[in-house]
Amino acid sequence: MNLKLHIKTYGCQMNQYDSSKIVDLLKNTHKYQLTDIAEEADILLLNTCSIREKAQEKLFHQLGRWRRLKKINPNLIIGVGGCVASQEGSNIRERANYVDIIFGPQTLHRLPEMINHVRITRSPVIDISFPEIEKFDCMPKPQAKGPTAFVSIIEGCDKYCSYCVVPYTRGIEVSRPCEDILLEINNLADQNVREIHLLGQNVNAYRGTRYGGGTCTFAELLRLVAAINGIDRIRFTTSHPIEFTDDLIDVYRDTPELVSFVHLPVQSGSDRILALMKRGHTVLEYKSIIRKLYAVRPSIQISSDFIVGFPGETEEDFRQTMNLISEVNFDMSFSFIYSPRPGTPAANMVDIVSQDEKKQRLYILQECIRKQAMKFSQAMKGTVQCILVEGTSRKNIMHLSGRTENNRVVNFIGNNGMIGQFVNVEIIDVYSNSLRGELISNQEKKYTLSA
């Protein structure tokens, strides 16, 4: 009998990556087949995120729906993983005693043994420890699911920003050995992956050991990945300004495989707020990085993260943030109203900003960046862009879909044989979240820089 696994994932790309690894692992060890239908599953897993507000409520709301399935099928196994699991631990079972497995981001590789334990003993198991990079040693060979692939290079974060829960839920920074990463990417390249997206809470903190001794920096790793045959594009998420080195900027100058798009979170344009956030850099230092990036890659486009309504944020602080947004001309952002995360220093700060004011500031910020992004998109109309065709369009299966170097989704008419290939497409229309293109007949030129 084929056993079925249903997994629901909240949060960042790292969580998406972890979930894909869980699927591959359990397929390998228990022959589980993935299903989108919770009602037909033998095991239900919830991979959680604690970054945003009401993460716990979201978790227990979902568990409440699954509880009904457990009553129908007592042999159903329910597991909770990810950052909320790491943060809450046994508290989850105190509120939901029907949960069988609780595992953290660093112990997902132990799921096969946890499942066996529950099956044999019918008793719950909790493992939210931090065994460094052990989980990567236990994972099966990566299975490509298209022409793009995520690869985790570093886990955790040591920066301890005052608002952030990541160091407490994913642990301190631990870099994977350089050769392990290169082996994984070579395996993916052999499966016709053309674009690699390197992942970490702070990728530019990467300091991986080499088998022959010594340390590999993030800049060096990028150069090594670019040298792998078949890998034509490299992206990465997320970076921190305090470790965005000149050596890393030089990689943008020398390495065409590294795309002309970077996500560099700043959170605020006020030095006073940045100090309260314990970000470790000033606005001027951030702008210096951007200036250097533009100098070596004039076509580069920048996205960022912003928190509005941080405790103590005044109108002047917010005005400085808006000034930075206009000056840098960000292409997009992930922006949110501040919400206190349990256990973080900022959770104890006095919050003087009303909720209505926070909402108004968020609207102003997002509207400004939306207009800037639309200007970038409009400027691309009539240009020829090099698209990596990722698959069929989500809205129209008769159309193909792919991304430009500057991370724009483009939908166009083509044949399925183009999936996994780079094609040149003329941009003929612009929408709020995508572009429409037309395949051009001359496909000789492999890359066309984004506008």
Swiss-Prot record:
Q: What is its EC class?
A: transferase
Cofactor(s) this protein requires: [4Fe-4S] cluster
| A GO MF label | 4 iron, 4 sulfur cluster binding
Residues that coordinate or bind [4Fe-4S] cluster 1: C12, C49, C83
Q: Where is the Radical SAM core domain?
A: 143-375
Q: Which residues bind [4Fe-4S] cluster 2?
A: C157, C161, C164
UniProt catalytic activity: N(6)-dimethylallyladenosine(37) in tRNA + (sulfur carrier)-SH + AH2 + 2 S-adenosyl-L-methionine = 2-methylsulfanyl-N(6)-dimethylallyladenosine(37) in tRNA + (sulfur carrier)-H + 5'-deoxyadenosine + L-methionine + A + S-adenosyl-L-homocysteine + 2 H(+)
Its GO CC terms are: cytosol
**Signal peptide range:** none
Report the InterPro entries cross-referenced here: Elp3/MiaA/NifB-like_rSAM, Methylthiotransferase, Methylthiotransferase_CS, Methylthiotransferase_N, Methylthiotransferase_N_sf, MiaB_methiolase, rSAM, rSAM_horseshoe
Bound how, and how many: what does the cofactor note say? Binds 2 [4Fe-4S] clusters. One cluster is coordinated with 3 cysteines and an exchangeable S-adenosyl-L-methionine.
Q: Where in this chain does the record put each MTTase N-terminal domain? A: 3-120
User: Where is this gene product found?
Assistant: Cytoplasm
Report the main location listed first in the record. cytoplasm
Q: Which part of the chain is the TRAM domain?
A: 378-441
Q: What does this protein do?
A: Catalyzes the methylthiolation of N6-(dimethylallyl)adenosine (i(6)A), leading to the formation of 2-methylthio-N6-(dimethylallyl)adenosine (ms(2)i(6)A) at position 37 in tRNAs that read codons beginning with uridine.
Relate the assembly described in the record.
Answer: Monomer.
Record NCBIfam families: miaB-methiolase (TIGR01574), MiaB/RimO family radical SAM methylthiotransferase (TIGR00089)
Report the sequence similarity comment from the record. Belongs to the methylthiotransferase family. MiaB subfamily.
- Please give the name of this protein: tRNA-2-methylthio-N(6)-dimethylallyladenosine synthase
Source gene?
miaB
